[in-house]
């Protein structure tokens, strides 16, 4: 496991009891990444989907539907979005803000100024 991923896995293990959320985008991403043929412990999409579903059903999980749009007037602060690779994290931060949650990421390029209403409590950058 890459060292960067280890940071995220360790953080989740020590905080999962506080609760966690997922949305269609993160669920699909999880299934995609963990079933990649090049992934060290790759499993079939069906297996990853089943395991993710079991963990989500195990409690402390909240499902956040795709209920925001970056096209909503004023939601994304586009002058603070500097590259296309930031768009997904900007969306996830906007979703976290709308649900009163927090985006935990390894990506240092995302900032709270990129989403209207975002505060430090809505974003945690690991590593």
How would you describe each model-predicted region?
Residues 1-22, 34-50, 115-118:
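Short, well-structured N-terminal submotif of metal-dependent ribonuclease cores
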Residues 16, 56, 97:
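Anion (oxyanion) recognition and catalysis
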Residues 69-82, 90-127:
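Acidic, PIN/NYN-like endoribonuclease modules and their adjacent C-terminal/linker elements
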Residues 26, 88-89:
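Catalytic-loop motifs flanking and including active-site residues across diverse enzymes
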Residues 19, 60-62, 121-122:
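Conserved beta-strand segments of alpha/beta enzyme cores
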Residues 24-28, 49-81:
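Acidic catalytic patch
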């Amino acid at each position: 496991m890459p060292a960067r991923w280890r940071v995220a896995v360790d953080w989740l293990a020590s905080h999962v009891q506080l609760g966690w959320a997922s949305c269609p985008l993160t669920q699909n991403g999880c299934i995609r990444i963990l079933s990649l043929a090049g992934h060290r412990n790759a499993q079939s999409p069906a297996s990853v989907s089943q395991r993710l579903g079991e963990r989500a059903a195990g409690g402390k999980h909240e499902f956040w539907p795709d209920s925001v749009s970056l096209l909503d007037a004023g939601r994304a602060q586009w002058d603070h979005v500097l590259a296309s690779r930031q768009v997904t994290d900007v969306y996830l931060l906007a979703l976290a803000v709308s649900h009163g949650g927090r985006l935990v990421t390894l990506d240092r390029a995302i900032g709270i100024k990129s989403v209207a209403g975002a505060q430090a409590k809505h974003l945690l950058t690991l590593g």
